[in-house]
Curated annotation (Swiss-Prot):
Alphabetical list of Pfam families matching this protein: 2-oxoacid_dh, Biotin_lipoyl
Species annotation: Buchnera aphidicola subsp. Schizaphis graminum (strain Sg)
Assembly and interaction partners: Forms a 24-polypeptide structural core with octahedral symmetry. Part of the 2-oxoglutarate dehydrogenase (OGDH) complex composed of E1 (2-oxoglutarate dehydrogenase), E2 (dihydrolipoamide succinyltransferase) and E3 (dihydrolipoamide dehydrogenase); the complex contains multiple copies of the three enzymatic components (E1, E2 and E3).
N6-lipoyllysine: modified positions: 44
Keyword annotations: Acyltransferase, Lipoyl, Transferase, Tricarboxylic acid cycle
Pathway involvement of the protein, from the record: Amino-acid degradation; L-lysine degradation via saccharopine pathway; glutaryl-CoA from L-lysine: step 6/6
Protein name as it appears in the record: Dihydrolipoyllysine-residue succinyltransferase component of 2-oxoglutarate dehydrogenase complex
Biological processes per GO annotation: L-lysine catabolic process to acetyl-CoA via saccharopine; tricarboxylic acid cycle
Length: 393
């Protein structure tokens, strides 16, 4: 028998370990090389581990919940070129009733195997064997059983006293919590605010949006304008494109901008590499790609590593103003917010303008107030007159 090991994928140096989330195959089940057999989760992404060959799952060495390292053995497969389906022995039953026998020598999990999925789910949620033992399985009569299971008379006293649902934090949520606490404890974080008139950007999008979409195949949003404004501002204020490493200040020559992306598992920050060399279309396409990958849990670890500055947009959720938290080891983060029409005094006259509050949180250990305020004002000025990028002022 040729046994092939199932290995944890290569993890980058910044990722210490991962946790086994879910096995999709059981020992003895046939597997093809295309199958995703187990999911593992790092503090950044969910990784799918595919079978290295065709065969039968022979052994699971790391169960769900286990902490594993890079290239650690998760289990092994007995390689087989000609796989024959292994028929699982059927449980003893009649066509009409499921046999109830206290001496029936199989596990509770196996006993409920022949119930329809909807019924198995309810039984597992109830976690009450007495409920199961009171039921006869009537073929194709799921509604009767569901009604029986949901009857309050079947609920024990302990169930009635439970008013909470306790679940284990995901690795991503744990890491987010750790990093937020790390930022609070290890940085001198301060936030400065400003506001920007978004009418010039709105007018640009309205004027060239249709042409842009026809040429590049993607709609132009607000984020590329902010990325470009940040890139130009970082060139003028190198101390913001830097970080503290013990007693040293590290200045970065490349401009890698992290973009906060909301996913079902939490917020992640994939990186726009060398954003200063990207066109508006490149930025928009990459952000769209990150969003899709985030929803589908397909973001790669290398896409999350190495950003030097972060942009986050709470405005898409309706936030009018906030104080974004620095993404360590970075030294600053820009917060975008909701665009809202407000009366503004312009040259002695009141005008209704689409305004957005901007927030820059920064590490005061490295960045002084003068630099932080000037940096944010530079972003504001570029957004209100995008021609500044063309003539570099």
């Amino acid at each position: 028998m040729n046994r092939i090991n199932i290995l944890v994928p290569d993890l980058p140096e910044s990722v210490n370990d991962a946790v086994v989330v879910k096995w999709y195959k059981k020992i003895g089940e046939q597997i093809s090389s295309e199958d995703n057999i187990v999911d593992i989760e790092t503090d950044k992404v969910m990784l799918e581990v595919s079978a290295p060959c065709n065969g039968i799952l022979n052994e699971i060495l790391e169960k769900e919940g286990s902490i594993v390292k890079s290239n650690q053995i998760l289990g092994n497969i007995v390689e087989s070129k000609n796989i024959e389906s292994k028929t699982k022995s059927k449980l003893e039953k009649s066509n009409k009733y499921f046999i109830k026998d206290k001496n029936f020598n199989i596990s509770f999990k196996e006993k409920i195997y022949n119930f329809p999925p909807s019924i198995r789910r309810i039984i597992r949620i109830k976690k009450n064997k007495e409920i199961f033992n009171e039921l006869n399985y009537i073929k194709n009569q799921e509604n009767i059983i569901e009604e029986k299971l949901n009857d309050q008379s079947f609920s024990n006293e302990k169930e009635k006293k439970i008013y909470e649902n306790r679940i284990k934090m995901t690795r991503l949520r744990q890491k987010i919590a750790e990093r937020l606490l790390e930022t609070k404890n290890n940085t001198a974080m301060l936030t400065t605010f400003n506001e920007v008139n978004m009418q010039p950007i709105i007018s640009l999008r309205k004027k060239y949006g249709e042409f842009f979409e026809k040429k590049h195949g993607v709609r132009i949003g607000f984020m590329p304008f902010f990325v470009k404004a940040v890139v130009e501002s970082l060139k003028k204020f190198p101390e913001i494109n830097a970080s503290i490493d013990k007693n040293d200040i590290v200045y970065y020559k490349n401009i890698d901008v992290s973009i906060a992306v909301s996913t079902p598992r939490g917020v992640i920050t994939p990186v726009l590499r060398n954003a200063d060399n990207m066109s508006m279309a490149d930025i928009e396409k990459k952000i769209k790609e990150f969003s899709i990958k985030g929803i589908e849990n397909k973001i790669k670890i290398e896409e999350l590593i190495g950003g030097n500055f972060t942009i986050t947009n709470g405005g898409i959720f309706g936030s009018l103003m906030s104080t974004p938290i620095i993404n360590p080891p970075q030294s600053a983060i820009l917060g975008m917010h909701l665009i809202k029409e407000r009366p503004m005094a312009i040259n002695g006259k009141v005008k209704i303008l689409p305004m957005m509050y901007l927030a820059l949180s920064y590490d005061h250990r490295l960045i002084d107030g003068k630099e932080s305020v000037s940096f944010l004002v530079t972003i504001k000025n570029i957004l209100e007159d995008f021609n500044r990028i063309i003539i570099n002022v």
